[in-house]
């Protein structure tokens, strides 16, 4: 992009968060790109670069959370499962990049399930797949809509704001 403003315009009006979330829900990337190319042909190279250069856009892990995850894994007292809104097509690249994802006992990727958080069915799916009892399962997420949906199913929750806040709340829950 020629400027930060041009990039922000593109992300706000062309490859929007809402558009990206549809791929997290299972829509194939080629189909998603075609929809935008029909509407915005003058942005062809940028639209194709959105997923074509996906790994360049990935941020790094939140290190404090990775440290907490590692501590939980080492204690071996609780099963660790991940429920992520992510495209099935970009997930393999993400797994390759972040070794800590292998520490989970199971991962449910929304794009593979054709549904995404906060759809309550995806919380049921992870509980059913891994034999988790909602009342004794803790769900941590940074999105309040996702927290509310998990609570409707009866999961315990922590609304993530920072690693320190999460660790404090986690220690309180685990001490009960």
Predicted regions and their residues:
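N-terminal helical cap/lid subdomain that shapes the substrate entry/recognition surface
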Residues: 1-67, 87-90
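Secondary-structure boundary motif
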Residues: 38, 42, 71-77, 96, ...
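Residue-level marker of regulatory loop/turn positions in helix-turn-helix DNA-binding domains and
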Residues: 61, 83, 115
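Catalytic-core regions built around general acid/base machinery
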Residues: 64-77, 103
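A generic structural motif
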Residues: 76-79, 155
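Generic beta-sheet signal
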Residues: 80-81, 137
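Asp-based, Mg2+/Mn2+-dependent phosphohydrolase catalytic module
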Residues: 87-88, 92-176
């Amino acid at each position: 992009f020629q400027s930060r403003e041009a990039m922000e315009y593109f992300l706000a009006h062309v490859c929007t968060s809402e558009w990206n979330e549809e791929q997290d829900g299972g829509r194939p990337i080629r189909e998603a790109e075609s929809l935008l190319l029909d509407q915005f042909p003058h942005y062809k190279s940028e639209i194709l670069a959105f997923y074509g250069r996906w790994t360049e856009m990935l941020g790094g892990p939140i290190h404090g959370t990775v440290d907490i995850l590692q501590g939980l894994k080492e204690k071996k007292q609780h099963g660790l499962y991940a429920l992520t809104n992510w495209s099935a097509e970009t997930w393999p690249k993400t797994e390759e990049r972040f070794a800590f994802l292998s520490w989970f006992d199971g991962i449910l990727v929304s794009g593979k399930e054709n549904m995404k958080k906060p759809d309550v069915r995806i919380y049921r799916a992870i509980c059913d797949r891994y034999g988790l009892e909602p009342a004794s399962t803790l769900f941590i997420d940074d999105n309040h809509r996702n927290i509310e949906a998990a609570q409707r199913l009866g999961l315990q929750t922590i609304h993530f704001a920072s690693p320190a806040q999460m660790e404090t709340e986690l220690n309180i829950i685990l001490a009960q």
